[in-house]
């Protein structure tokens, strides 16, 4: 509709809008009102993508941009999490996310976090399924391994060094399985448009993501920081590309 109104080429057949919608849905709590994803979708497609020139021109991940917009605008709705347990009951239970409980010093169930029997957004509850999907994308060479691996490893090292729990492997596993890390590392940070294309750039990008996520999680006011870390690093991609792009042999020599 926007492209028709602005007399632009119609690109709906490339399915990029559908992919953005799917990723946005994975970033939402399971019981949000229907108008929340509608507003988020409009923001992602029109504000983040189309206003900057359409597919390939957006400076940050559209789904994450919409998620942050919704968090700022409708914080109460976006942080109201509920889930149905695996025990067969259909009564939703409202609770804090595991990362929020962990930050408050409470005990969390690592097995439930790994399998997905816990509160959170749709795409951050089952670390197991996200890992399977991420490994599949890497095996099929749809995404590079550099960004997700460097991201997860760097965050893990940051947590061990600055998490205040020493080398507690259980605490480390809880940090890695909780929140949007797996979703962000494999499905959001690897977006072709908003991530570096050079191998060195992808490594630097992943390391920066891990450091920023660790800072936001451990020292910030919120228990989560994946979305903000990815968006911030999206803004640094041009600089990362400039620094890590190899100079052509002989460039700058005498003519």
Describe the residue ranges of each PLM region.
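C-terminal ends of transmembrane helices
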Residues: 1-9, 45-56, 130-141, 186-195
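Alpha-helical transmembrane segments and their membrane-interface exit regions
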Residues: 1, 42-51, 67-72, 154-159, ...
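Hydrophobic, membrane-inserted alpha-helices
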Residues: 17-26, 41-48, 129-137, 153-159, ...
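Cytosolic-side transmembrane-helix boundaries in multi-pass membrane proteins
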Residues: 218-255
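Membrane-interface helix-loop-helix junctions at boundaries between adjacent transmembrane segments
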Residues: 12, 16-17, 22-90
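Long hydrophobic alpha-helical segments that form multi-pass transmembrane helix bundles
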Residues: 56-131
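Loop-to-transmembrane alpha-helix initiation sites
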Residues: 59, 63, 172-180, 202-204, ...
